[in-house]
């Protein structure tokens, strides 16, 4: 994922 966001980073 984006990496900078805990939720989007996991995707």
Curated annotation (Swiss-Prot):
Kindly report the protein's main subcellular placement as a broad class.
secreted
User: Which keywords label this protein?
Assistant: Amidation, Neuropeptide, Secreted
Listed GO CC annotations: extracellular region
Let me know which tissues express this protein, per UniProt: Expressed in the CNS and midgut but not in the ring gland, thoracic perisympathetic organs (tPSO) and abdominal perisympathetic organs (aPSO) (at protein level).
Q: Where in the cell is it found?
A: Secreted
Q: Which residues carry this modification: Arginine amide?
A: 11
Q: Which biological processes are named by the entry's GO terms?
A: neuropeptide signaling pathway
Record bears the keyword Secreted:
yes
Role description:
Myoactive peptide.
Q: What is this protein's record name? A: Tachykinin-related peptide GLGNNAFLGVR-amide
Q: Which organism is it from?
A: Delia radicum (Cabbage root fly)
Query: Where is the organism placed in the taxonomic lineage, from the top?
Result: Eukaryota, Metazoa, Ecdysozoa, Arthropoda, Hexapoda
């Amino acid at each position: 994922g984006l990496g900078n966001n805990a939720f989007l980073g996991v995707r």
